[in-house]
Structure formats: C-alpha cells, structure tokens
C-alpha cells in the first residue's frame, strides 16, 4: 500500500487516508439524490441516472488515484447537469441522447487537450497570487453552499439573500438550520482539540441528532417541501435500470441535430468544465500544500487526464459531465494526501448502489457544517496574498469575491484573469503578463459576448 500510494513520502497513513476518503464521500453523497432529480427532467430514468452517477464517480475516483495519486474525488457536476436538463433538453428541445453525445465529445476533446499539455499550460499560466485568490474564493463558495444547504441563508426578494427565520416552519427549516449550527460547533471544537476525523464525526453526530429530533417530534417529515425522513429505510432497487441509458449517447438515429447548436452546446460544457476543474485543483491543492514554489502542481497532466476520462465514461453510462468535486477539500482537511483517499471514496460510491436508500438519507443540514468549516480552512490562504502589490491583489480580490456572488468557480477565474491583464497593462507591467494569459483573457471576453 505504501509503495503504491507513497504514504510515508506524503506524511500520511492508511487510517488517515480512509477517514479522509469517507469524509469526502459523506460530503458529496448528496449528488446520488440530486443528480437524478435534475437529469430526470430530461426524460431519463432516475434509477438509471443514480447508477450512472455512482459508477461514473467511482471510475473518476479510481482514475485520479491510479493515474495521479491525488486525494481528489470526482462526480457529475452541479450546474452542468442543470444546463444539460433545462437548457439543452428543455429550452433547446434536444433529446437527452444528443446531450450525452455532446458530453462524450467534450470528454474526448479534454483527453486530447490533456495529452497535448494545453490544460497543463493553462494551469501553469495563471499567476501564483491569482491561484491564492482562487483558493480563497472556493472557500467562500463552499461555505456559501453549506449555508444554503443548511437553510441558514435563504432567498430574499429585497436583498437576494437573508438569514433564516428560525421560528417560521421550525419543525422543518428551523430545526434543520439549528442542527447545522450545532454541527458546525461540534466540528470546530473537535478540530481545536486536534481530534482525528473531526469533520466526519461532525457529519454523523448532526445526522444522529436529526434522527433523535424526528423521533421526538421536533423534526417533521414534509416530502412535498423537500424535508424527508432522516431514518434510513431499505427499499428494493433495480440494478438493471442502467441498461436504459448505457451507450445511448451513440443512439442518435432519427434525431435532428443542428451542427451549430451542437458546437455551442459542446463548447459550453467544455468551457465550464475546464475552468471549474482547474479552479478546484488549484484551490484544493493549495490547501493541501501540494503546489511547488512556482505555484505548479506535480502530475497535473495525469489529474486532468483522469477528469477527462471520467467525463467520457460518464456520458457512456448515462450522466452529465463528471468533474473534480470541490468537496474533496473536506477530505484534504482530514489529512488526505494520496490516491488511497480517492480509492476509498470510489468504493463507497460503488457500495452506495446497493445501499442507496441509506446514503441518500443523509440530510443537507448534516453535511452543511462540513462545508462551512472547510470554507474557513480554505479562506486562511488570504494571508498569502500580497496586498501591498495592487497589480496582484486587486485581480485576486475580484476573483475571490466573484466566485460566491456569481455562484461559479469558472466565472470567478474569468473575472480574475481579465482583471489581471487589464490592471497590469494599465500599470505599465505588461512584461508580467504571459502570452497565454492574453489568450485566456480574450477567450473569456469572447465568451461573455457570444455564449
């Protein structure tokens, strides 16, 4: 095991990696329930989507582990699945088979870009300070997702977002938000006390408290409002359902496809996936202290190749773009440093096929504390930004603030790259800007104009 994953070289142990892998899985297990609920709007079978999601995630995790030896987990990405279901199959009116084929082609393009070092060059072209900004921005973004998942932050017509009213719908929204607060303090206290597995313990403890609240009547099930039973229940699951989506991305006979539309769809998947993945790798790798003195990530080519392979494999199985998950940061926070962590996460995704009713019972308010706390850990990188150099700090600031407010890692990177080029040009520091940064800035601007 040590020889395969270089545990001693990375100052870790089997126990630490296993705990990290379990923690990562627990924080992203929600995708097993969320992805089918979104993609089923396209007409796909929800059971087939669940199986495709689990298997594609496992393939991605294994590829990341054995090709790159990184503790990064993969699964079908949120945002891209919504674009798949509601834009491509919804407003544009295309069959889900066409959408899957677009994802498959995108994956192939990614494989080519990874093998030809294009994606690696983009990663290395981003300035170190901007990478720090990406890491902080992802921390804020992850924390915001956690606050939303706990219903601590809710929508507001006047201010866009506001704090939850605990008294309104206390037995559903209120109690869940309160338990999330308690869970966050549990993790924080355990972390301060240097307890191993503090994040995982916090998730399980919050879930158990929720079950107790349900049994005592403090938490009430309201499926119509999205508040389900917290008590795991066994129900039959049709494992043959995946036959309804497997290989259907190639079954395009009789389907009308506008070539221009298809190119736009494929490029949209490609663009968002590329910079979401790069942003996640930058942020999580920075937190794990994996970047070298030049801000480069060793074995980045293999990591990007694993991501690309998982995308095409996922399309064949029957799911939208598979990408590196930002929730990997929770496992890194537990000490995960090698591919063994990813292997554990991958196996749990396979096991989840059998025990799907159990894993999909984990409530959002139980995993939210983990995301909120991981956000704190990632935001700590802000002290590494040199605020005395305004040509470096202003783009980093715009990058980190736009990620949570625009609810997108790729948009934050776009703003950061464009502002970096403009600020340094105006400041007379054009020599700092690499040719590839000019190209990226231009591509981002064109994206806002035409896509």
Q: Where on the chain are the PLM-derived regions?
A:
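Helix-loop-helix hairpins and the membrane-proximal interhelical loops
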Residues: 1-48, 166-167, 203-301, 445-446
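Helix-loop-helix junctions within the multi-pass membrane cores of secondary transporters/permeases
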Residues: 2-35, 56, 77-86, 90-138, ...
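Short helix-coil transition sites and intra-membrane helix breaks within transmembrane domains
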Residues: 26-30, 67-77, 110-113, 194-195, ...
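Helix-coil boundary and interhelical linker segments in multi-pass alpha-helical membrane proteins
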Residues: 37-48, 87-98, 256-262, 361-363, ...
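Transmembrane helix-loop junctions in multipass membrane proteins, especially transporters and channels
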Residues: 40, 65, 69, 73, ...
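Loop-to-helix transition at the N-terminal end of transmembrane alpha-helices
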Residues: 43-62
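Transmembrane alpha-helix interface/packing and boundary motifs in multi-pass membrane proteins
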Residues: 60-73, 189-191, 268-276, 307-317, ...
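Membrane-embedded alpha-helical modules
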Residues: 92-208, 212, 343-451
């Amino acid at each position: 095991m040590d020889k395969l994953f270089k545990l001693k070289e990375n100052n870790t142990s089997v126990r630490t990696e296993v705990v990290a892998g379990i923690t990562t899985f627990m924080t992203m297990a929600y995708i097993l329930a969320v992805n089918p609920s979104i993609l089923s709007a396209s007409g796909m079978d929800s059971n087939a989507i669940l199986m495709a999601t689990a298997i594609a995630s496992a393939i991605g995790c294994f590829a990341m582990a054995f090709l790159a030896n990184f503790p990064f987990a993969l699964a079908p990405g949120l945002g891209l699945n919504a674009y798949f279901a509601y834009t491509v199959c919804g407003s544009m009116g295309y069959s889900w088979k066409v959408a899957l084929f677009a994802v498959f082609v995108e994956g192939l393009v990614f494989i080519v870009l990874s093998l030809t070092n294009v994606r690696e060059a983009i990663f290395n072209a981003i300035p170190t300070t901007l990478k720090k900004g990406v890491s902080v921005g992802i921390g804020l973004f992850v924390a915001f997702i956690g606050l939303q998942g706990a219903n601590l932050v809710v929508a507001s017509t006047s201010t866009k977002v506001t704090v939850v009213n605990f008294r309104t719908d206390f037995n559903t929204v209120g109690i869940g938000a309160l338990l999330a607060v308690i869970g966050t303090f549990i993790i924080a206290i355990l972390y301060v006390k240097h307890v191993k597995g503090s994040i995982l313990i916090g998730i399980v403890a919050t879930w158990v408290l929720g079950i107790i609240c349900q049994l005592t009547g403090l938490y009430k099930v309201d499926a119509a409002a999205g508040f389900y039973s917290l008590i795991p229940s066994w129900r039959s699951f049709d494992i043959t359902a995946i036959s309804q989506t497997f290989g259907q991305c190639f079954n395009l006979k009789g389907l009308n496809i506008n070539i221009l539309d298809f190119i736009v769809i494929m490029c949209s998947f490609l663009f968002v996936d590329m910079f979401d993945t790069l942003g996640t790798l930058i942020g999580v790798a920075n937190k794990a202290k994996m970047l070298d003195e030049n801000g480069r990530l060793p074995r980045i080519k293999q990591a990007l190749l694993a991501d690309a392979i998982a995308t095409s494999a996922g399309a064949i199985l029957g799911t939208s773009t598979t990408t590196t998950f930002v929730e990997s940061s929770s496992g890194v926070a537990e000490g995960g440093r090698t591919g063994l962590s990813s292997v554990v996460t991958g196996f749990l995704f396979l096991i989840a096929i059998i025990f799907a009713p159990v894993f999909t019972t984990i409530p959002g308010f139980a995993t939210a504390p983990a995301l909120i706390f991981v956000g704190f850990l990632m935001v700590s990188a802000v002290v590494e930004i040199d605020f005395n150099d305004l040509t470096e700090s202003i783009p980093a600031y715009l990058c980190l603030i736009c990620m949570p407010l625009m609810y997108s890692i790729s948009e934050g990177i776009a703003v950061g790259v464009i502002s970096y080029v403009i600020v340094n040009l105006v400041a007379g520091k054009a020599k700092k800007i690499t040719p590839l940064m000019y190209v990226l800035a231009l591509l981002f601007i064109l994206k806002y104009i035409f896509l």
